[in-house]
């Protein structure tokens, strides 16, 4: 998707989130799962200090059944298994993939929290091609009844399991920066209504919610900070200011550094228009705007693939960045009060989009010089890319 700063006409910032993964459903591992009694999360606190992010079996299965048997270098196996044991988020990115939730919940022990991404708005990812969704503009009722209501029903049936939700990556940030894109104008009402409905309906005692807020290279532009905070705050208030709402998720499926200083693009000609040159600064700066707008402002930050910097020709190049590596592992030790945790939201090894220019879902960002080529369709397993992430991991997994 394309994101532009109104203050810097030369700046073109983009991001996108991969489409559904073909991962098949698996039976939960036989282990002690859930707590003996109902979980009640206090969204006024950082729950990641109490719970460890769960390493879900869907991503584990991709690594154990797709990645490890096909490693070009057997010496990478130990590192691959470390990734399989690392907590990451389960993506509910189609109506059919809601079926992933029940077995995922059934495998979570009491001291862990299941990360779940809710990602199926009508007209999803309105400014990109690689990650368009199944629901068309105007199918909001299907989103509510077949997707969100089903998720809520399953979560209610598992009150003894802690869950952290990331709500609809890329949706509201697109409305802030891509109002000139007709598809985004068409999707706007459904995005706002759908996000508010998701927040209200999934406001459950065992759940803590974070809404997607793009990243520092998106809403971090000086001209985007205030309207961005106001857009997110409107959704929060339209949902009735849900008790289980904690704040924002940043850098989802992204590449931005946590605390690199000066930032990766600090020497660019338009850098003076963006004071948020890393995610740490963005969380602090945008957090102040969120507070002023009347919304909770704590954050989780996706560090799954940001281990290497200086790879992108432009800040907006989002697709399968060549040379990338796994980043900091999930941890509540961020050193910043507003940052609850580093988390792995995007499963490293699942493609961002195809580099085949003849494909229906081809996005030109996946054919950029700094994008890994060849690459398969969004969500498909990308073996060569996974191995590169292992080799370039920082801190090293080798």
Swiss-Prot record:
Swiss-Prot/TrEMBL GO biological process terms: cellulose catabolic process
EC annotation from Swiss-Prot or TrEMBL: 3.2.1.91
Subcellular location: Secreted
PTM: Both N- and O-glycosylated.
Active site location: 125, 170 (proton donor)
GO cellular component, one term: extracellular region
Signal peptide: 1-18
Sugar-bearing residue positions: 70
SUPFAM superfamilies found in the cross-reference section: Glycosyl hydrolases family 6, cellulases
PANTHER family: GLUCANASE, PTHR34876
Gene: CEL6C
Protein name per UniProt: 1,4-beta-D-glucan cellobiohydrolase CEL6C
UniProt main location, coarse: secreted
């Amino acid at each position: 998707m394309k994101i532009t700063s109104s203050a810097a006409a030369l700046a073109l910032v983009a991001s996108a989130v991969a489409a559904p993964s073909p991962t098949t459903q698996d039976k939960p591992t036989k282990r002690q799962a859930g707590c003996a009694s109902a979980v009640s999360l206090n969204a006024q606190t950082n729950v990641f200090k109490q719970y460890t992010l769960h390493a879900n079996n869907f991503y584990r299965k991709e690594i154990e059944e797709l990645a490890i048997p096909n490693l070009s270098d057997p010496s990478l196996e130990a590192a691959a298994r470390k990734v399989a044991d690392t907590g990451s988020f389960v993506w509910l990115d189609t109506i059919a993939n809601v079926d992933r939730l029940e077995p995922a919940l059934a495998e979570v022990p009491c001291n862990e929290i299941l990360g779940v991404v809710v990602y199926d708005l009508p007209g999803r990812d309105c400014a990109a091609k690689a990650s368009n969704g199944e629901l068309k503009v105007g199918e909001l009722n299907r989103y509510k009844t077949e997707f969100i209501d089903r998720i809520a029903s399953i979560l209610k049936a598992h009150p003894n399991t802690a869950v952290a939700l990331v709500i609809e990556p890329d949706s509201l940030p697109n409305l802030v920066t891509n109002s000139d894109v007709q598809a985004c104008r068409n999707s706007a009402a459904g995005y706002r209504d759908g996000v508010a409905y998701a927040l209200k309906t999934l406001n459950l005692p065992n759940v803590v919610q974070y809404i997607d807020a793009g990243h520092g290279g998106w809403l971090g532009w000086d001209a985007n900070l205030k309207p961005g905070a106001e857009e997110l705050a409107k959704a929060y208030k339209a949902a009735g200011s849900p008790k289980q709402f904690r704040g924002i998720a940043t850098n989802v499926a992204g590449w931005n550094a946590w605390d690199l200083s000066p930032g990766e693009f600090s020497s660019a000609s338009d850098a003076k228009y963006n004071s948020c040159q890393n995610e740490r600064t963005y969380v602090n700066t945008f957090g102040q705007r969120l507070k002023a707008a009347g919304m909770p402002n704590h954050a989780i930050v996706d560090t799954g693939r940001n281990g290497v910097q200086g790879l992108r020709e432009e800040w907006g190049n989002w697709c399968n960045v060549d040379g990338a590596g796994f980043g900091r592992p999930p941890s509540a030790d961020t050193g910043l009060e507003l940052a609850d945790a580093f988390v792995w939201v995007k499963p490293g090894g699942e493609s961002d989009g195809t580099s085949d220019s003849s494909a229906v879902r081809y996005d030109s960002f996946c054919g950029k010089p700094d994008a890994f080529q060849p690459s398969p369709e969004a969500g498909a397993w990308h073996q060569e890319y996974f191995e590169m992430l292992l080799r370039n991991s920082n801190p090293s997994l080798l």
